[in-house]
Amino acid sequence: MSRFWSPFVKDLVPYVPGEQPKLARLVKLNTNENPYGPSPKALEAMRGELNDNLRLYPDPNGDRLKQAVAEYYGVTPAQVFVGNGSDEVLAHIFHGLFQHDAPLLFPDISYSFYPVYCGLYGIAFEQVALDEQFQIRIEDYKKPNAGIIFPNPNAPTGCLMPLQVVEQLLQANRDSVVVVDEAYIDFGGETAISLVDRYDNLLVTQTLSKSRSLAGLRVGLAVGHPDLIEALERIKNSFNSYPLDRAAIVGAAVAFEDREYFEDTCRKVIDSREVLVGQLQAKGFEVLPSAANFIFARHPQQDAGELAARLREQGVIVRHFKQPRIAQFLRITIGTPEMNQALLDALS
């Protein structure tokens, strides 16, 4: 702490990102990165941007990427916002859409950046308990609120809310912005983007870090009514008018256009997930139903924190959360078959 810090900074409780170890030979299953590389076509497109044009600023609107997203989802570019990772997109949403008199609502078990954003922007919030199956109860959200946000599939549980239930939540909150954070939707869910033309209060966020293997590039997006998108553009242009560099815009656009590679990669992750679930269950683990590129598991005879530490000693890193309701679970990223086997060998 410095004497130059403002009281505001002193009171901040920052987000703690997943560990990015520098040690070699570690099996890294802790931050939900895709074990397969980006689209070769996307890599080639990005290499093509490494030329003298880097002296020029990139397109502040990211129109090339917006067009690719719009074509992929059957919406218009005016319904698309792009930013420097979905975390930045979410930050603009919190800043621009959730500062009202009533509290923001989100699940008690969800993305741990949500309360951090609330602290940063002075947003009152209420964490609503998930049920015993780690699902949202629609009735719990029928109360005055400044907005609603939740990850679907849930992070860190991986549990999916079916699209018809998402629509029920929208119908129950016509006068509030409902944000569906779909970082993991491509691994087994149905996107709510299909609903944006029917609900002007719906905003869907996604990232290219997971299913499109571009975590190191930092590209995120939001899709919703043009009025909501305009609000995000106003925030963006009051903060950083050039959030995406030239290579990121082109590479992300091509990643959307290369559907064959994307679908093949997702299928490999899903297939590996289902195999690993069965293998862990055979070892006595309880594994929650997952529609993500990770699983959430616990063993009735093993303390999760101790197990994570012992796995690390064997060169395998997984994620352990100390939150009371989930303190006995481990979040395990789906790796390649070889990475998953290393996990099983370490457990043995």
From Swiss-Prot:
Description of how the protein assembles with itself and partners: Homodimer.
Pathway involvement of the protein, from the record: Amino-acid biosynthesis; L-histidine biosynthesis; L-histidine from 5-phospho-alpha-D-ribose 1-diphosphate: step 7/9
GO annotation (BP), single: L-histidine biosynthetic process
Residues where N6-(pyridoxal phosphate)lysine is found: K210
Alphabetized Gene3D superfamilies for the sequence: Aspartate Aminotransferase, domain 1, Type I PLP-dependent aspartate aminotransferase-like (Major domain)
InterPro entries per UniProt: Aminotrans_II_pyridoxalP_BS, Aminotransferase_I/II_large, HisP_aminotrans, HistidinolP_aminotransfase, PyrdxlP-dep_Trfase, PyrdxlP-dep_Trfase_major, PyrdxlP-dep_Trfase_small
Cofactor dependency: pyridoxal 5'-phosphate
Gene from which the chain derives: hisC
Entry EC no(s): 2.6.1.9
SUPFAM superfamilies, per the entry: PLP-dependent transferases
Organism (species): Pseudomonas putida (strain ATCC 700007 / DSM 6899 / JCM 31910 / BCRC 17059 / LMG 24140 / F1)
Keyword entries, A-Z: Amino-acid biosynthesis, Aminotransferase, Histidine biosynthesis, Pyridoxal phosphate, Transferase
The keyword Amino-acid biosynthesis is annotated on this UniProt entry: yes
Record-level Gene Ontology MF annotations: histidinol-phosphate transaminase activity; pyridoxal phosphate binding
Catalytic activity: L-histidinol phosphate + 2-oxoglutarate = 3-(imidazol-4-yl)-2-oxopropyl phosphate + L-glutamate
Name of this protein: Histidinol-phosphate aminotransferase
Family as reported in the entry's similarity comment: Belongs to the class-II pyridoxal-phosphate-dependent aminotransferase family. Histidinol-phosphate aminotransferase subfamily.
CDD domains tied to this protein: AAT_like
